[in-house]
């Protein structure tokens, strides 16, 4: 769309001006029908969504003339029609789109607690050669679930998962 061309053109100009080591964005969606929902919403972990994301990432990388890094987002819900888990989705996306990963260890920790999986399994499944950067952060603990807020100290569990990553 025209809006996409304007925003991506502005990004390309900014990259030319500041020359960052890399550019990143979250693996998520944030709106529908031109309405911004002001949150990072999880991608359905389906082959159709994966194909869509690969095409979009390749289009952006082709336009920018460089690889981008994609960051895993914290998730709070899953889709009933998911046909793969999140780490399979992220790994396949990185490989098929030939992009970097920005691994947010806190986001893995939050998602693991919220969905009841082992975060180490997520980390171990990622193509380590594609990890360009690692983020650590804090979150809010609401007992039954965690929310990624970046406004609390990093907890020991996130540090443990980070040590496992290294």
What residues fall within each predicted segment?
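Gly/Pro-rich active-site loop or hairpin
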Residues: 40-44, 50, 111-166
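Active-site beta-loop-alpha junctions enriched in small/polar residues
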Residues: 1, 27-28, 73-75, 106-110, ...
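Proteins with a high burden of low-complexity, intrinsically disordered sequence enriched in S/T/G/P/A and R
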Residues: 1, 6, 151-155
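Active-site acidic/histidine proton-transfer and metal-coordination neighborhood
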Residues: 3-101
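Conserved, mostly hydrophobic/aromatic
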Residues: 23, 104, 134
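A short secondary-structure junction signal
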Residues: 79-83, 105, 112-115
């Amino acid at each position: 769309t025209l809006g996409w061309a304007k925003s991506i053109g502005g990004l390309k100009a900014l990259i030319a001006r500041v020359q960052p080591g890399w550019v990143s964005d979250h693996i998520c969606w944030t709106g529908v029908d031109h309405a911004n929902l002001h949150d990072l919403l999880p991608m359905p972990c389906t082959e159709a969504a994966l194909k869509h994301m690969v095409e979009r990432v390749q289009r952006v990388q082709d336009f920018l003339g460089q690889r981008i890094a994609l960051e895993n987002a914290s998730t709070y819900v899953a889709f009933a029609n998911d046909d793969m888990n999140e780490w399979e989705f992220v790994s396949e996306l990185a490989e098929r789109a030939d992009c970097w990963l920005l691994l947010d260890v806190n986001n893995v920790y939050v998602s693991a607690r919220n969905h009841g999986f082992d975060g180490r399994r997520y980390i171990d499944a990622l193509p380590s050669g594609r990890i360009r950067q690692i983020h650590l952060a804090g979150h809010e603990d609401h007992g039954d679930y965690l929310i990624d807020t970046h406004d609390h100290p990093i907890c020991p569990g996130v540090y443990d998962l980070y040590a496992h990553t290294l």
